[in-house]
């Protein structure tokens, strides 16, 4: 695969395989279904993957950074690229690709901010002590100051704080995947079922009045089928804060989705759509879509639709927001961006697997930077 191979040769680390596939198709074989007309975008990506030219530089952390080229067309206004802000629980775990806490799940930049003291249990209760509430407000404000285009949370129970979050910022706030419910309900007839998948079916019950208030949708409506994933083999790792073996869980989750759809097939109310409430379910969305042939809405589709409202259509857009983002996600570790005087308030510590991954990333960036600088120096001597 040309683009992926070029990525490996250059030493750059791009974790999102879907992005690599898209870029590969852009550079090699588009086919009769698509056509990429923006040669400038191709030139930028080509320079990113092949050599460090006058449009690129290294940042202080040794990461390869792409600079947008000079805009020679006065009709085009290069806007700041839209980015996402994510409020994180005081809880660290190794996120899978597709999880909200994995930056590689998105095709735009992401800023994270942990709220010290805001544990999963506290979030699930829907009540915040005054000190944690203020830290939550401060975190929303901080993300707003970074210029993010929208804000979400890394847990479905952040729905409890949807009203609080939107009172702090003028940016769009979708604290839970459940915020998509009104659009999903509007799209299907009243005699069709919508399946709501959650980490635990019982945990959604206390939220029903809140969902009705915030989304204008009654979850007690018989058109909703609540599906708990608590008995899916391997998915208990979510509740335990351990790394989820996605490959192991995948067939069981797909089978659960297939069985749920089959149970209602041929009835007066067939299932027409699936919505994943839990932020750790999106890694399975593609497989469930393929198996059921149904649309699957999750926290990633929620964020994408929110950010897409600020992005150009690549066919005829005029701002070319993609020229302003180099494709390298902002580096983040658990506890980053928390003010020094609040770090001691963190209840949890960074997960060992994430520490190891971070150290490996530092070593890779250091090695890549040294190799590129040596290559540049050798080229200069040859001249």
Curated annotation (Swiss-Prot):
<keyword id="KW-0456">Lyase</keyword>
<dbReference type="GO" id="GO:0047869">
    <property type="term" value="F:dimethylpropiothetin dethiomethylase activity"/>
</dbReference>
<protein>
    <recommendedName>
        <fullName>Dimethylsulfoniopropionate lyase 6</fullName>
        <ecNumber>4.4.1.3</ecNumber>
    </recommendedName>
</protein>
<comment type="similarity">
    <text>Belongs to the aspartate/glutamate racemases family. ALMA1 subfamily.</text>
</comment>
<comment type="function">
    <text>Mediates cleavage of dimethylsulfoniopropionate (DMSP) into dimethyl sulfide (DMS) and acrylate. DMS is the principal form by which sulfur is transported from oceans to the atmosphere and is a key component of the ocean sulfur cycle.</text>
</comment>
<comment type="subunit">
    <text>Homotetramer.</text>
</comment>
